[in-house]
């Protein structure tokens, strides 16, 4: 019998994690999953993720680095510090017992995800319908965004500098939005195209209204009605879109997936599953030997460019400030600290899918519940 064969002392054993979990382990697994589902349901933009992490970190005793710099407060082993950049990138530190130049232990992940962004002047009317003009951010399958309930998340900065947080489409009483598609009876030509060409990026316009304002003398009555609704609720005018950053994301909560609740369906798991678990791990660290860091950044989906991506000098500048508050700043200290550090830069991979076995090599693929 196969089961009676002697196990090799040299070969790798592929065990299923579920077989190894104790009842206590299983309880912890599903409690973590529930916390993660709640996080993924509420935090659908990089700004929302960073705000959540900052709030939790402050409750856990982390201090804002900028406040410490202004107070010229020295850092010692065990101190907890965070630095934030433009509300879209955050780094958390627990100061170690050993000198910073001995290196740091770093976890890294990104908190941005593929999505649709509103353009600077997005609202327009066409044939009695109000729409929002968008462009896509990151790598998306354009056809997946058709006829899906969508929500708007973001911030608007008004002319007087007031910042307004916007979330529409998540509460039960909220409307949702969507990108329209063709009826199957009208899609003969569309169906002949490849998946990549069947939906053009320029057609990913979000339908947001169809009722005209009660004034027959004005032009673009449906658009004007949408502007009135936004003004009544948020006090904004059309010009405020120019200084807004509004993201279009799938509406609705993350959910357990499968009869056995063994999987999770959520928008943005690339790479927030790594960001969330890195943050959870960071919250358990107290007085390490080496300084520990969790670095959660923006802009990975478009090449890590820009002020809040890893092409910026945010991390190096933050390490320099940390070294200064530890009382041992020098260019050489920073260089040694970075050179001697070790980092796990985590991102997601696809598990082997029996529906598409041709795109993966089983011997090198990851499997649900088993890893690689």
Which ranges hold each PLM region?
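N-terminal hydrophobic/helix-forming segments and targeting peptides
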Residues: 1-372
């Amino acid at each position: 019998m196969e089961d009676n064969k002697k196990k090799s002392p040299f070969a790798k054993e592929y065990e299923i994690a579920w077989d190894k979990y104790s009842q206590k382990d299983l309880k912890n697994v599903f409690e973590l999953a529930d916390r993660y589902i709640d996080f993924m349901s509420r935090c659908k933009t990089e700004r929302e993720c960073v705000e959540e992490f900052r709030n939790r970190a402050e409750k856990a005793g982390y201090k804002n680095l900028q406040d410490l710099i202004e107070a010229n407060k020295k850092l010692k082993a065990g101190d907890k510090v965070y630095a934030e950049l433009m509300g879209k990138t955050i780094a958390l530190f627990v100061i170690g017992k050993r000198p910073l130049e001995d290196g740091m232990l770093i976890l890294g992940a990104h908190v941005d995800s593929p999505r649709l962004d509103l353009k600077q002047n997005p609202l327009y009317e066409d044939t009695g319908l109000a729409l929002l003009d968008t462009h896509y951010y990151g790598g998306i399958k354009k056809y997946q965004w058709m006829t899906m309930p969508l929500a708007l998340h973001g911030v608007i900065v008004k002319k007087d500098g007031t910042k307004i947080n916007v979330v529409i489409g998540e509460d039960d009483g909220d409307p949702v939005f969507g990108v329209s598609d063709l009826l199957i009876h009208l899609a003969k030509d569309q169906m002949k195209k490849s998946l990549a060409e069947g939906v053009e990026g320029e057609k990913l316009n979000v339908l947001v209204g169809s009722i005209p304002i009660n004034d027959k003398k004005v032009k673009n009555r449906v658009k004007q009605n949408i502007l009135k609704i936004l003004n009544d609720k948020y006090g904004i005018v059309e010009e405020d879109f120019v200084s807004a950053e509004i993201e279009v994301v799938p509406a609705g909560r993350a959910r357990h997936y499968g009869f056995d609740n063994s999987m999770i369906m959520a928008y943005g798991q690339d790479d927030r599953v790594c960001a969330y678990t890195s943050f959870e791990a960071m919250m358990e660290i107290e007085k390490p030997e080496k300084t520990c860091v969790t670095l959660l950044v923006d802009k990975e989906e478009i090449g890590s460019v820009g002020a809040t991506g890893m092409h910026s000098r945010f991390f190096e500048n933050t390490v320099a400030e940390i070294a200064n508050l530890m009382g041992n700043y020098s260019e050489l200290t920073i260089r040694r600290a970075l050179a001697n550090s070790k980092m796990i830069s985590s991102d997601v991979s696809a598990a082997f899918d029996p529906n598409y076995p041709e795109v993966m090599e089983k011997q090198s693929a990851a499997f649900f519940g088993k890893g690689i």
